[in-house]
Amino acid sequence: MNWKEQLEEIGNCQDSNKAIQDYNKILTIQESPDDIKEEAILRLAKLFVKIGKGDQLPTLLRSVRPFFDKISKPKTDKIVRNFIDIFSTVPDNLTTLIEFVKENIQWCKDTNRIYLRQRLETKLFTLMFEAKDYANALSGLTTLLTEIKRLDDKPLLVEIQLVESRIQHALKNIPKARAALTSARTNANTIYCPPKLQAEIDMQSGILHSEEKDYKTAFSYFFESYETYDSLEDPFAMKALKYMLLCKIMTNQTDDVHALVNGKIGLKYHNNRSIEAITQISKSHAKRSLHMFQEVTKEFSDQLSDDPIIHSHLTELYSNLLEQNLCRIIEPFSRVEISHIAKLIDLPVDVVERKLSLMILDKKYNGILDQGTGTLIVFEEQKEDKLFNCSLETIGALSRVVDLLYEKTNKLS
């Protein structure tokens, strides 16, 4: 039996403990080929994750480091990066993963592995972004960016600038986020850009356009991103689809949401709770039902609150729905108690009072709050007097004529 057949036999073994022993045996046998050992390392890592022993991965990688001295640096780089990608699939281990990547960065510095260090640092700052450690991530990224620009490593430069754009967006610095993304897209156009990286760029472009309320352009970017992710069978395809549906809701095109979900694109996600959540939000928005909107956000809180992009736009959507409902309730009154409005809309009095104050300050509603009596006094909208405007225009025209006559008189004299 050759080495590849042995690997396949171990992979088909139902006894996990025996499989682990056999993989370790291959790693310790001097005669086993290097490529077989490389495959055994990654298979063993995946097995640990599969059986819920992901915490064993750091120990495993440390134990095989002597083997890395016997193979080329590019092969080592590939194994370590794949190993970290496997470790990334372990649930709820972000803090451990960050420390593990830091440990490997230090190992790269000690062994003078510059190429691998730069890529692991990029991975580290991406993980720090996910952990919401924005300040440290941005600080380290700026230093790395300067180093990579000197080397003119365009593929890595694109990845770094994309991460920078995400961090700046998280910090609500949209101009800098857009500048970083523009640089990433410009550099990506000068090289072969892997499909997944291009999909990430399109996704970030859509997010920034949606922040600027350009939902039509955002939708087109999300659609491009979805098609690429879908062709790669990447789970991020569902995320892109969610953002596509959100764009349709924000532009009041709720009929298109139904068409997308029940069409070719949405069929494979028919029973997905995240897509179901967005669909229900669309229905509540179409009905202008604040109560239904609240029920949906409560029922699907895990699917809607975990994503900051979705959460941000749903907050805006809720605010718009609340304004529309308040305007509809207040419309018949010239003076009404705030407590009565709160009772009709089924919200706490302080929430309603705060929202009415903002609407009045933003000049979305013409009235005042009498806090002494706890009432809203509504002013009638003053109709524009067309005769007054016409009179002003006539007087202005006469003034210009008189000025011209005065100038001519001065010339004659």
Swiss-Prot record:
Q: What is this protein called?
A: 26S proteasome non-ATPase regulatory subunit 11
Q: Name one GO biological process term.
A: ubiquitin-dependent protein catabolic process
| Species this chain originates from | Dictyostelium discoideum (Social amoeba)
Query: PCI domain spans which residues?
Result: 217-383
Q: Which proteins does it associate with, and in what oligomeric form?
A: Component of the lid subcomplex of the 19S proteasome regulatory particle complex (also named PA700 complex). The 26S proteasome consists of a 20S proteasome core and two 19S regulatory subunits.
> Does this entry carry the keyword Transferase?
no
Cellular component (GO) terms are: proteasome regulatory particle; proteasome regulatory particle, lid subcomplex
Into which family does the record put it?
Answer: Belongs to the proteasome subunit S9 family.
Q: Which domain of life is it from?
A: Eukaryota
Q: Which UniProt keywords apply?
A: Proteasome
**Lineage start:** Eukaryota, Amoebozoa, Evosea, Eumycetozoa, Dictyostelia
Q: Does the keyword S-adenosyl-L-methionine apply?
A: no
User: What's the stated role of this polypeptide?
Assistant: Component of the lid subcomplex of the 26S proteasome, a multiprotein complex involved in the ATP-dependent degradation of ubiquitinated proteins. In the complex, psmD11 is required for proteasome assembly.
> Which terms in the Gene Ontology molecular function aspect does this entry carry?
structural molecule activity
